[in-house]
């Protein structure tokens, strides 16, 4: 049973929503974040990356940096940039990219569900990345970056979402990257009750994106439980901000690979090794964008090759059978020497939103070989999570990204 509850939201005043809404904090490096905040001073990135308010030489993890995030947020509330909605309710958040809309239910998910495995994960997290968000949430006393969750389709939830969207939205704007964002507030008490009950029927929800944010929110909750052992079970810190989407609405883009060198091999040797695993077509003039599972594009020596996995090569396993796993375990590791893609500096990952031309550009600039992938499917992701297994790094690329700063959950 999934506990997905309504909450009291701090949200932008309607006239400031488009200015405040920001891409996730980890999309930017330090220099990019500072540049973005300088050109968009009301962007939530100023709060999400508070070091942007300090000199470049400042320690971005110093206590005063996190305190600045808290002060700036409270000042924006005081100035009217944000409004505090006292009503506990759900919101709908629709994002439309390339004429494809997806609508999530904005809510608070249970920390206990995360701990007990009702909320299923498919990625490892790195402790050093968690620490920054733990401090940010704890000092802010609020969560601002929603966790992107998925659930298997529920007919009644689809009906309720469609009904609620007949009302006028609170926000309706197009961000600089061309994504349309619309938000509705659920006003009906009966609808709130029914949404909650429908989620309670679900055996599981799934983290699609935001594993580090989720882990950080949970660790803050566990810390506060230790500090406040008499706090009620429904204390706000026992829940974390999330947006839940029916998995059949979601688009997964591929995560492509680029490698720094050929590990001492010639191009001819690499093609020979590839032919042991794949049916190789090429050289080709046109870039290869894989159209089916088991197809990989390889850019080598300024030209493309179309690789199609041979029968019997793919292991019958939810993780080892993923295209990204087959490429890693049977080619990148033994042939190109990429033993651990999490730590090896010779490999980089390029989100599918940037297109295959970016792979050509990287190879012309500093890399020697690139691989365009067919995207992991939602069914593959759910199967891995249901089995309690973890995917290799950079297996999925979800677009569009949820904006931070539109919904704030105070702890």
Please provide the spans of the model-predicted regions.
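Surface-exposed, charge/polar-rich loops and edge strands
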Residues: 1-411
């Amino acid at each position: 049973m999934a506990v997905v509850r309504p909450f009291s939201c701090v949200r932008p005043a309607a006239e400031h929503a488009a200015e405040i809404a920001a891409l996730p904090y980890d999309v930017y490096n330090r220099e990019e974040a500072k540049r973005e905040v300088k050109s968009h001073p009301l962007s939530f990135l100023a709060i999400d990356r508070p070091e942007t308010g300090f000199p470049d030489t400042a320690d971005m993890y110093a206590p005063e940096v996190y305190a600045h995030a808290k002060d700036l947020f409270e000042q924006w509330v005081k100035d009217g940039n944000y409004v505090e909605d006292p009503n506990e309710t759900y919101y709908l958040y629709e994002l439309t990219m390339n004429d494809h809309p997806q609508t999530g239910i904005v809510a608070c998910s249970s920390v206990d569900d995360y701990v007990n495995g009702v909320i299923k994960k498919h990625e490892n997290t790195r402790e050093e990345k968690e620490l920054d968000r733990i401090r940010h949430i704890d000092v802010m006393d609020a969560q601002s970056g929603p966790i992107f969750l998925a659930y298997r389709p529920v007919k009644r939830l689809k009906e309720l979402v469609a009904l609620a969207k007949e009302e006028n939205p609170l926000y309706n704007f197009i961000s600089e990257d061309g994504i349309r964002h619309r938000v509705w507030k659920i006003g009906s008490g009966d609808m709130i009750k029914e949404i909650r009950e429908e989620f309670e029927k679900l055996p599981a929800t799934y983290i699609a994106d935001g594993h580090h944010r989720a882990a950080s929110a949970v660790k803050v909750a566990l810390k506060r439980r230790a500090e406040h052992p008499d706090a009620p079970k429904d204390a706000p810190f026992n829940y974390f901000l999330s947006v839940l989407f029916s998995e059949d609405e979601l688009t997964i883009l591929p995560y492509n690979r680029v490698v720094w060198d050929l590990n001492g091999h010639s191009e001819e040797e690499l093609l020979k090794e590839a032919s042991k695993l794949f049916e190789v077509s090429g050289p080709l003039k046109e870039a290869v964008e894989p159209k089916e599972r088991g197809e990989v594009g390889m850019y080598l020596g300024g030209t493309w090759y179309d690789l199609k996995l041979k029968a019997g090569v793919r292991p019958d396993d939810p993780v080892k059978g993923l295209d990204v796993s087959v490429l890693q375990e049977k080619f990148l590791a033994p042939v190109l020497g990429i033993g651990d893609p999490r730590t090896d500096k010779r490999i980089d990952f390029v989100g599918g939103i940037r297109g295959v031309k970016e792979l050509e550009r990287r190879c012309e600039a500093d890399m020697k070989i690139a691989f365009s992938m067919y995207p992991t499917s939602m069914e593959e992701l759910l199967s891995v999570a249901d089995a309690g297994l973890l995917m290799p790094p950079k297996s999925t690329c979800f677009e569009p990204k949820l904006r931070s700063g539109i919904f704030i959950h105070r702890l």
